[in-house]
Protein backbone atom coordinates (compact mmCIF):
# COMPACT_ATOMS: atom_id res chain seq x y z
CA UNK A 1 0.00 0.00 0.00
CA UNK A 2 1.02 3.58 -0.64
CA UNK A 3 -0.01 5.90 2.19
CA UNK A 4 -0.27 9.65 1.65
CA UNK A 5 -0.17 11.94 4.71
CA UNK A 6 -2.82 14.64 5.01
CA UNK A 7 -1.24 17.59 6.80
CA UNK A 8 -3.82 20.37 6.43
CA UNK A 9 -4.71 22.63 9.36
CA UNK A 10 -8.41 22.82 8.47
CA UNK A 11 -10.79 19.83 8.66
CA UNK A 12 -12.62 20.60 5.39
CA UNK A 13 -9.29 21.01 3.59
CA UNK A 14 -8.11 17.72 5.10
CA UNK A 15 -11.15 15.83 3.79
CA UNK A 16 -10.73 17.36 0.31
CA UNK A 17 -7.00 16.56 0.34
CA UNK A 18 -7.78 12.96 1.31
CA UNK A 19 -10.19 12.56 -1.61
CA UNK A 20 -7.54 13.87 -4.01
CA UNK A 21 -4.77 11.76 -2.43
CA UNK A 22 -6.80 8.56 -2.80
CA UNK A 23 -6.68 9.00 -6.58
CA UNK A 24 -2.96 8.19 -6.30
CA UNK A 25 -2.52 6.26 -3.06
CA UNK A 26 -4.30 3.36 -1.36
CA UNK A 27 -4.72 4.96 2.03
CA UNK A 28 -4.18 8.31 3.75
CA UNK A 29 -2.79 9.25 7.14
CA UNK A 30 -4.79 11.97 8.85
CA UNK A 31 -2.33 13.93 10.98
CA UNK A 32 -4.96 15.05 13.44
CA UNK A 33 -2.32 16.74 15.63
CA UNK A 34 -1.75 19.28 12.84
CA UNK A 35 -5.41 20.34 12.71
CA UNK A 36 -6.36 23.59 14.43
CA UNK A 37 -9.54 22.14 15.85
CA UNK A 38 -11.02 18.65 15.71
CA UNK A 39 -14.23 17.11 17.05
CA UNK A 40 -15.48 13.57 17.58
CA UNK A 41 -17.69 14.09 14.51
CA UNK A 42 -14.59 14.90 12.44
CA UNK A 43 -12.98 11.65 13.61
CA UNK A 44 -16.12 9.80 12.46
CA UNK A 45 -15.76 11.37 9.00
CA UNK A 46 -12.06 10.53 8.81
CA UNK A 47 -12.82 6.94 9.83
CA UNK A 48 -15.06 6.48 6.76
CA UNK A 49 -12.00 6.96 4.55
CA UNK A 50 -9.29 4.25 4.20
CA UNK A 51 -6.91 5.84 6.68
CA UNK A 52 -4.49 5.83 9.56
CA UNK A 53 -5.62 8.15 12.36
CA UNK A 54 -2.52 9.67 13.93
CA UNK A 55 -2.52 12.22 16.75
CA UNK A 56 1.21 12.55 17.27
CA UNK A 57 2.27 13.73 20.73
CA UNK A 58 4.56 16.74 20.97
CA UNK A 59 7.13 14.65 22.85
CA UNK A 60 7.35 12.31 19.83
CA UNK A 61 7.87 15.07 17.26
CA UNK A 62 4.18 15.85 16.75
CA UNK A 63 2.08 18.95 17.24
CA UNK A 64 -0.61 17.86 19.73
CA UNK A 65 -0.80 20.59 22.36
CA UNK A 66 -3.98 19.58 24.20
CA UNK A 67 -4.30 16.99 26.97
CA UNK A 68 -3.21 13.40 26.58
CA UNK A 69 -6.62 12.35 27.85
CA UNK A 70 -8.35 14.13 24.96
CA UNK A 71 -5.93 12.52 22.53
CA UNK A 72 -6.68 9.03 23.85
CA UNK A 73 -10.45 9.66 23.75
CA UNK A 74 -10.25 10.78 20.10
CA UNK A 75 -8.26 7.65 19.23
CA UNK A 76 -10.84 5.51 21.04
CA UNK A 77 -13.54 7.19 18.97
CA UNK A 78 -11.64 6.28 15.80
CA UNK A 79 -11.49 2.67 17.03
CA UNK A 80 -15.21 2.73 17.86
CA UNK A 81 -15.89 3.88 14.29
CA UNK A 82 -13.72 1.13 12.79
CA UNK A 83 -10.98 3.34 11.35
CA UNK A 84 -8.69 1.10 9.29
CA UNK A 85 -5.67 1.91 11.49
CA UNK A 86 -4.79 4.06 14.48
CA UNK A 87 -1.20 4.94 15.34
CA UNK A 88 -0.04 5.24 18.94
CA UNK A 89 3.49 5.66 20.25
CA UNK A 90 5.49 2.91 21.94
CA UNK A 91 6.37 5.46 24.65
CA UNK A 92 2.69 6.26 25.33
CA UNK A 93 1.91 4.72 28.73
CA UNK A 94 -1.75 4.18 27.77
CA UNK A 95 -1.19 2.27 24.53
CA UNK A 96 -2.37 -1.03 26.08
CA UNK A 97 -5.57 0.74 27.13
CA UNK A 98 -6.34 1.38 23.46
CA UNK A 99 -5.69 -2.26 22.54
CA UNK A 100 -7.98 -3.41 25.38
CA UNK A 101 -10.68 -0.97 24.24
CA UNK A 102 -10.41 -2.26 20.66
CA UNK A 103 -10.70 -5.87 21.82
CA UNK A 104 -13.66 -5.20 24.11
CA UNK A 105 -15.53 -3.17 21.48
CA UNK A 106 -15.03 -5.82 18.76
CA UNK A 107 -13.65 -3.15 16.45
CA UNK A 108 -11.90 -4.05 13.19
CA UNK A 109 -9.28 -1.33 13.68
CA UNK A 110 -5.65 -2.43 13.49
CA UNK A 111 -3.32 -0.74 15.98
CA UNK A 112 0.10 0.49 14.86
CA UNK A 113 2.66 0.98 17.64
CA UNK A 114 5.28 3.49 16.54
CA UNK A 115 8.77 4.64 17.44
CA UNK A 116 10.71 7.62 16.04
CA UNK A 117 14.32 8.74 16.17
CA UNK A 118 14.81 12.01 14.29
CA UNK A 119 18.59 12.06 14.81
CA UNK A 120 19.92 8.62 13.93
CA UNK A 121 19.25 4.98 13.12
CA UNK A 122 20.10 2.91 16.21
CA UNK A 123 22.06 -0.33 16.06
CA UNK A 124 20.13 -3.32 14.71
CA UNK A 125 19.89 -5.06 18.12
CA UNK A 126 18.23 -1.98 19.58
CA UNK A 127 15.80 -1.78 16.65
CA UNK A 128 14.91 -5.47 17.04
CA UNK A 129 14.16 -4.80 20.71
CA UNK A 130 11.89 -1.89 19.71
CA UNK A 131 10.01 -3.97 17.12
CA UNK A 132 9.56 -6.91 19.50
CA UNK A 133 8.13 -4.59 22.18
CA UNK A 134 5.76 -3.03 19.63
CA UNK A 135 4.48 -6.40 18.41
CA UNK A 136 3.75 -7.50 21.98
CA UNK A 137 1.38 -4.54 22.29
CA UNK A 138 -0.21 -3.90 18.90
CA UNK A 139 -0.87 -5.50 15.52
CA UNK A 140 1.80 -3.71 13.51
CA UNK A 141 5.25 -2.42 14.48
CA UNK A 142 6.39 0.88 13.02
CA UNK A 143 9.69 2.68 13.28
CA UNK A 144 10.99 5.76 11.51
CA UNK A 145 14.64 6.62 12.07
CA UNK A 146 16.99 9.11 10.44
CA UNK A 147 19.29 7.36 7.98
CA UNK A 148 22.74 8.89 7.50
CA UNK A 149 24.36 6.19 5.36
CA UNK A 150 23.93 3.12 3.16
CA UNK A 151 24.61 1.03 6.27
CA UNK A 152 21.61 2.61 8.00
CA UNK A 153 19.46 1.93 4.95
CA UNK A 154 20.55 -1.72 4.90
CA UNK A 155 19.70 -2.11 8.61
CA UNK A 156 16.18 -0.86 7.94
CA UNK A 157 15.66 -3.05 4.86
CA UNK A 158 16.99 -6.03 6.80
CA UNK A 159 14.39 -5.55 9.52
CA UNK A 160 11.59 -5.11 6.99
CA UNK A 161 12.57 -8.49 5.58
CA UNK A 162 12.81 -10.10 9.05
CA UNK A 163 9.36 -8.88 10.12
CA UNK A 164 7.70 -8.90 6.67
CA UNK A 165 3.95 -8.38 6.76
CA UNK A 166 3.80 -6.96 10.28
CA UNK A 167 6.06 -3.91 10.04
CA UNK A 168 6.20 -0.40 8.66
CA UNK A 169 9.81 0.82 8.54
CA UNK A 170 11.11 4.13 7.24
CA UNK A 171 14.51 5.71 6.81
CA UNK A 172 14.06 9.47 7.01
CA UNK A 173 16.30 11.88 5.11
CA UNK A 174 17.97 11.69 1.70
CA UNK A 175 19.97 8.55 2.59
CA UNK A 176 16.78 6.78 3.58
CA UNK A 177 14.86 7.33 0.34
CA UNK A 178 15.69 3.81 -0.83
CA UNK A 179 13.72 2.39 2.12
CA UNK A 180 10.65 4.23 0.83
CA UNK A 181 11.13 2.96 -2.73
CA UNK A 182 12.01 -0.67 -1.89
CA UNK A 183 9.97 -0.97 1.31
CA UNK A 184 7.01 -2.81 -0.20
CA UNK A 185 9.28 -5.37 -1.86
CA UNK A 186 11.10 -5.98 1.42
CA UNK A 187 7.96 -6.63 3.46
CA UNK A 188 6.80 -3.26 4.77
CA UNK A 189 2.98 -3.16 4.92
CA UNK A 190 3.01 0.30 3.40
CA UNK A 191 5.27 3.09 2.27
CA UNK A 192 4.64 6.80 2.72
CA UNK A 193 4.63 9.19 -0.23
CA UNK A 194 3.47 12.79 -0.46
CA UNK A 195 1.31 14.90 -2.69
CA UNK A 196 3.42 17.60 -4.34
CA UNK A 197 4.79 20.05 -1.75
CA UNK A 198 3.07 18.32 1.18
CA UNK A 199 5.71 16.06 2.71
CA UNK A 200 5.22 15.23 6.39
CA UNK A 201 8.77 13.93 6.96
CA UNK A 202 12.25 14.50 5.49
CA UNK A 203 13.01 12.35 2.45
CA UNK A 204 9.39 11.59 1.59
CA UNK A 205 9.02 10.92 -2.14
CA UNK A 206 6.37 12.58 -4.31
CA UNK A 207 3.65 9.96 -4.94
CA UNK A 208 3.64 10.40 -8.73
CA UNK A 209 7.42 9.95 -8.88
CA UNK A 210 7.22 6.94 -6.55
CA UNK A 211 4.61 5.24 -8.74
CA UNK A 212 6.76 5.84 -11.83
CA UNK A 213 9.80 4.30 -10.10
CA UNK A 214 7.80 1.30 -8.83
CA UNK A 215 6.48 0.72 -12.35
CA UNK A 216 10.04 0.76 -13.73
CA UNK A 217 11.40 -1.71 -11.19
CA UNK A 218 8.40 -3.98 -11.67
Swiss-Prot record:
EC number: 4.2.1.10
UniProt KW Lyase keyword: yes
InterPro entries listed in its UniProt record: 3-dehydroquinate_DH_AS (IPR018508), Aldolase_TIM (IPR013785), DHquinase_I (IPR001381), Type-I_3-dehydroquinase (IPR050146)
Name of this chain's protein: 3-dehydroquinate dehydratase
A GO biological-process term: amino acid biosynthetic process
Subunit description: Homodimer.
Active-site feature positions: 116 (proton donor/acceptor), 142 (schiff-base intermediate with substrate)
CDD domains named among the record's database cross-references: DHQase_I (cd00502)
Gene Ontology MF, one: 3-dehydroquinate dehydratase activity
PROSITE patterns given in the database record: DEHYDROQUINASE_I
Biological or metabolic pathway of the protein: Metabolic intermediate biosynthesis; chorismate biosynthesis; chorismate from D-erythrose 4-phosphate and phosphoenolpyruvate: step 3/7
Binding positions (3-dehydroquinate): 29-31, 56, 180, 200, 204
Similarity section: Belongs to the type-I 3-dehydroquinase family.
Domain of life according to the entry: Archaea
Known catalytic reactions: 3-dehydroquinate = 3-dehydroshikimate + H2O
